[in-house]
Amino acid sequence: MSIPTTPDVKITPLMPKRIPKNKLFVSPESSWTPDSDGKWQLHPFAFDRWDVEEMAYHDTCSLHIGLNPFNVFKVHGSDYLKMLTCATVNTFHNFPVGKARHVIFCDDGGKILLDGILVRTGEEDFLGFNLVDPNFLNMQMGNPFQIECKNLREEYFVFQLCGKRSLEIVEQVCRKDLHDLKFMYSTQAEIDGKEVLILRTGMSGTLAYEIHGNAADAPEIYQKLLDIGAEYGIQESGRLCYVNQHCVGSIFQLAEHFNIRFAPLDDEFILSGSLPRDSELQFHSPYDCGWGNLVKFDHDFPGKAALLAESQRHHNTAVHLIWNKEDILKVQAAVMDPDKRVDYMDMVGDYDFKNNCSTIHMDAVYDGDKLIGASSDRMLSAKTREMISICTIDEDYAVEGTEVEVLWGNPGTYQMRLRATVTLMPYIKENRNNNFDVESIPHPVFDK
């Protein structure tokens, strides 16, 4: 039976040339129809077995392209930093050209509304990734700031490469020695005469780089990465691997690990897991995520009073949990008991195919009858073969080796308490991107 297709339509470089007329579910949260106008990207849930994809960002190099099309704003004007200072927890002292910075927007209660990355590409030029629309933000403030802004969503691509061979691949593709590029810094380069930006950052915690450029150049550059990367063991990675990277990399991600309190999106995300639906633990402050060092109180910003009070009192912090293997097997056995309604536990990780997959799985963490934290993004590490999760927890329990219990199962099901052990962040403690010695990697030699 042939599948009816539409004529060629305006698509991103990552979509096929001809699109089946019926609705598609490729990456589960990314359903696409010809009239969805690029709202969702087409991207596989997986290219290979989950463990093959995940081991690549430890042993060789994983290549992820599922962020495209991405919310990218090109901004001109020194007032942009003044505007962000008024709107975020950050200050922008010591922010030279080429530097990237993690930027956090909070509500009046000190809970995170949005976070993303800002790259300074010139004295008055910036690229904002997953940040509030600068024109909208300026308008909300009464348009006091002089800036020029363009949304590059349809014109920009981002490729993410993670793993100890990532530097070698990027250098060979660009034909440029990038050993001097520091963590969270960017530089300009070319790939076959096409201008790109290289940023040393990544989600997996391992050595990682991003390649940014014009969307029209994306297919050719992608193929070149695969061709050159084959020698170094490059592995395409799908959505599941990318989500799990954040847990292994000890990086909280909005809508994966915590919810936001924002009226227009009240129906956008739904909770699954054992955490009570009215629990404040579903909303995270920077301190809940271990990002308290980014909060600067030398300026006014939304949420300042709440965060200042939080910083001065007993509060939560971020850890990992290692789940007890015997208790995990008890859940697997209970699933097959017809007298119990136990939620199935996917060994690879929690991924809920509901509400177009805008579901956040969060489990309650207890010490006896005391609710002490919220666990999310449970996954089986392909490298350590430990079941781990990322967790915000009462700081009294943020001690290596502390034993806690995670409640497994949605309300209304047969719930089980599973033992877990606290381990401090980061989960990957050796050869992290921020301190990886790139001089242990040979400098490139290029064929003439």
Where are the regions that the model predicts?
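Extended, compositionally biased flexible segments
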Residues: 59-125, 129-146
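Conserved, structured C-terminal
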Residues: 2-57, 120-448
